[in-house]
Amino acid sequence: CQMAEKSLMQAVEHAKNAAGTSTKIIGSIAPLEDCYKPELFPGRDAAISEFAYLGGEMVEAEVDILILETMNSMAETEAGLCALKNTDLTLWVSFVLKDENHLLSGDRLDDTLNMLNNFQIEMVLLNCNPLGRTKNAVDNIVDNWSDGWGIYPNLGIGEPSADGCITEYESMEKYLSVVEYALSGG
């Protein structure tokens, strides 16, 4: 763990040096086991303990914002937020989706967004989703979330591969049309 802690401290230090004072540094915590396998969630108690540890490391590293990134289930998102709510860091959450209405776990996106109202979340994002799914989900975000939101979709065609290799890409025109749709508020 000491090597990981040292690497985190150095990474944040390098980011701050490169960014200067006007850019916020975001610390990211992904699902504890696998972004694309919600069934591997270790359970609430184990998750709260691990998220609290990771959040403490991010606080010590002095990141400005903490994002629970590529969250795939409501239970893991809630456990993470319970563990992080007292960090005094700005909190963001991003979700990977099964379709425009459901997280990868099958949990309803609107129910999950409603759960977020129990916490102080500055930003909700959709990430690691194909362009079409992202575009279709924008309306769900607009209808069910009144605070800040955004998207950063995958450019790869189809579902993410286990090895992370993207072999086919969407056109820049299609990407820009999804961005324009999101900017127009759905």
Regions found by a protein language model. Give the residues of each.
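Domain-level signal for soluble alpha/beta catalytic cores
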Residues: 1-186
